[in-house]
Regions:
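Bacterial Sec-dependent N-terminal signal peptides
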Residues: 1-34, 691
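N-terminal, intrinsically disordered low-complexity tails/presequences enriched in Lys/Ser/Pro
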Residues: 29-68, 131-146
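Small-residue hinge/turn detector
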Residues: 85-89, 115-116
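Transmembrane beta-strand segments of Gram-negative outer membrane beta-barrel proteins
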Residues: 139-176, 194, 198-204, 240, ...
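Exposed, low-structure sequence patches enriched in small/polar residues
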Residues: 181-185, 286-288, 342-375, 382-691
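Outer-membrane beta-barrel proteins
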Residues: 207-224, 277-284, 337-340, 411-413, ...
Length: 691
């Protein structure tokens, strides 16, 4: 213990020294913005736990790798960039309409309301190209001749052994068949993609998670296979999707299997529906399988979609659905028995009519399972969806003008439950914007594919008012602030009575020099929680208080060397139990020589938390299409290094090594995931071939 304490003290001293050394830097190089920084600032602790944000990350990564041509860009494409406000999108399109094609990205500073940070972020996702004829029908021979293809493969190698990979006697496995994983410990994925400009896409994704069997009796190939074809903007046809696809209409009350804005991201954009999108990620839930079509008839866009998909579920002895399984793991006989054991058939329509700044839409969805969802015996689930068929419909509406933007949707679910969400964005000036949002989701509202703005993560049993402000206080100082007051009319998990809460955030970004950037975020949340005595008798509700602090310093030492220092601090307070807290201090460095052949990202961090409840989330650089937003608790150290080498215009190699050392335990994890030791070392490899 004495050696560990001494080691911890030394590590803290090292990181504090690095922190102040970074503060003392006074360089003369331009501040570097990356889309990784954008994701980190838009993502909260709650957001990163949802698969939809992994899809969002994949989409951003793909746009970054295949940027839009600014001279042919559409409003729908601009809306996929989460840092653009509705008014700025209109201003970009208006500039193109009045001034014609852009000659260089330097013209962005001439667009009305275009601030410095947005000018730095946009070149990560756009380029200046030739103006093309819109909605032209491409010839098949041109598609095949000029289309671009890509093969991307990834291999994760854990340099340790979990309990699920140990050898056990046959007698033990006969009694406990789920004690051992059926496959090896490697995780492997393979992606093939083709695209012809922004009009034609197709691809195939194959994935095998750690522990899953492959190329054997249990799985003849990979555990997960996905294929898609997407065609956009051909004549009157807006979009045609075949295979796996995702949908997002309105504010997400009826249909949204794409990502939903968190409270921080709401300050940057409005998050209107994006329509039909291909599903090319390795996420094994949140997508449809079938056909979707969007067609333009006058000023109305008509979208039709049909899906017949197999889903994972937990079934009882009567083969009724008790819950859906969304983690995609099929490592043991028990997990494999839940694979694709329920079929879900879905059909729907969406209409969107536009006129003079107004958009009026209507969505109707019907879906049916081959078995029924069982009524839960848990009191807080008394109003949850039951049965095997569901019908949901809603109306969404948008009004855009120079001074204000109004977005909303109102929906009705099976059984008459209602939901509504409405937001008003006031553009007070070029520097100040206010946002007011009201939502009311009844306790008996059922929409199985809804994903909208909420506190509890579901579109049910919630009412709240959100007030936010986005302020450019000066040329170098930006501030974002919000307060969200919410209540639940019915019970929630571990909340045995109607409850209420409040969520407050203040976020500041300061760039005093072109080489220095400072970022600070404070978040306070109060939510009611059950109080019980030593005999587990319910005594009532009491507030649990959470404080979250994050500070970040960015510094460019040279055109090729970039430093980032992060400090996270969490504190939880509940009744007289005192408080538990945790912090994470890290230093990251990025090196990219002028030749652009190689790039190195490395980081080191020390974490110390009192409990799992005070765990700290942190984002670190990783491989392409790898969403790396992980949590740490206890006491330990995290090291990682990522190397990217662009061997040529065709080949790219990436490798990442991650090392986690715990000072407060001799084992990591539990059950099949248990590691005998205090170390976790992982190796990640990736190869990309473009042709």
């Amino acid at each position: 213990m004495g050696k560990n304490s001494q080691r911890s003290a030394e590590l803290r001293s090292i990181f504090i020294f690095l922190f102040f050394v970074t503060f003392s830097i006074n360089a003369v190089y331009s501040q570097t913005y990356t889309w990784d920084d954008l994701v980190m600032k838009l993502t909260s602790e709650e957001d990163c736990e949802y698969d939809s944000w992994k899809n969002f990350y994949d989409d951003l990564c793909e746009i970054h790798d295949n940027p839009y041509n600014i001279n042919t860009i559409t409003k729908d494409q601009l809306e996929t960039l989460p840092f653009l406000t509705p008014q700025l999108i209109e201003n970009i399109l208006y500039y193109q309409y009045t001034h014609g094609p852009m000659k260089s990205l330097g013209e962005l500073q001439l667009v009305e309301d275009m601030d410095y940070e947005t000018r730095q972020l946009l070149p990560l996702f756009i380029y200046v190209g030739e103006q093309e004829k819109k909605n032209a029908i491409p010839k098949l021979k041109n598609i095949l001749k000029y289309g671009k293809q890509e093969i991307l493969t990834r291999l994760d190698v854990p340099l340790y052994r979990k309990a699920g990979y140990m050898e056990y006697p046959d007698s033990v496995l006969a009694k406990y068949p789920n004690r051992k994983y059926m496959g090896n410990s490697l995780h492997h994925s393979l992606r093939y993609s083709f695209h012809y400009g922004t009009k034609v896409f197709w691809g195939l994704t194959a994935d095998k998670d750690s522990g899953e069997p492959a190329f054997g009796k249990a799985n003849s190939t990979y555990d997960y296979l996905s294929a898609y074809v997407l065609i956009k903007n051909i004549g009157r046809m807006n979009t045609l999707a075949l295979g796996n696809y995702r949908l997002h209409y309105g504010q997400g009350l009826v249909m949204n299997t794409d990502f939903s804005l968190g409270k921080t991201a709401m300050l940057s954009t409005a998050g209107t529906g994006k329509g039909i999108k291909k599903h090319s990620s390795t996420s094994e839930s949140g997508y449809f399988k079938g056909i979707a079509l969007s067609y333009k008839v006058g000023k109305t866009d008509v979208s039709l979609f049909y899906s017949y998909n197999d889903r994972d579920a937990n079934l009882d002895d009567s083969l009724l659905i008790t819950s859906f399984k969304t983690d995609g793991n099929h490592r043991t006989p028990l997990e494999l028995s839940k694979k694709h054991n329920v079929t879900d058939e879905l059909a729907g329509i969406h209409l969107d009519y536009s006129f003079k700044g107004f958009h009026l839409g209507a969505t109707a969805v019907y879906n049916r399972f081959n078995t029924s969802i069982k009524k839960s015996s848990q009191p807080y689930k008394a109003y949850d969806a039951i049965g095997n068929s569901f019908c949901t419909s809603g109306i969404d509406y948008v009004y855009n003008s120079h001074l204000l933007n109004f977005y909303g949707e109102t929906a009705i679910g099976q059984g008459g439950g209602m939901a509504t969400v409405n937001s008003l964005h006031l553009n007070i000036s070029e520097r100040y914007k206010l946002i007011l949002l009201y939502r009311n989701y009844s306790k008996d509202y059922h929409a199985l594919f809804a994903n909208a703005f909420s506190e509890g993560g579901s579109v049910q049993n919630e009412e709240g008012i959100y007030l936010g402000a986005d302020m450019k206080l000066s040329r170098t100082l930006n501030a974002k602030i919000y307060v969200d007051c919410f209540r639940s009319p019915w019970l929630r998990y571990q909340v045995s009575a109607p409850s209420k809460g409040i969520d407050f955030l203040s976020q500041f970004s300061w760039v005093p020099l072109k080489s220095i950037g400072l970022f600070f975020k404070y978040r306070f949340k109060s939510k009611e929680k059950d109080v019980k005595d030593e005999n587990n008798n319910w005594l009532g509700l009491a507030n649990k208080y959470q404080h979250r602090l994050q500070g970040q310093l960015n510094a460019n030492l040279s055109p090729s060397l970039f430093l980032q220092t992060d400090l996270y601090y969490n504190q939880n307070i509940f009744l007289n139990a005192g408080h538990d807290s945790g912090y994470f201090l890290s230093q990251q460095v990025s090196w990219k020589p002028i030749s652009n052949i190689c790039k190195v990202d490395a980081g080191a961090g020390y974490f110390h938390t009192d409990s799992y409840d005070s765990r700290v989330y942190t984002y670190e650089k990783s491989l392409l299409y790898a969403f790396s937003f992980t949590s740490f608790y206890g006491e330990g150290m995290r090291l990682y290094c990522t190397v990217r080498v662009d061997c040529s215009d065709h080949f790219m190699l990436m490798a990442k090594y991650g090392h986690t050392k715990y000072f407060d335990r001799s084992t990591i994890g539990s059950s099949n995931e248990k590691i005998n030791g205090s170390l976790k070392n992982d190796l990640y490899l990736q190869l990309r071939y473009k042709f």
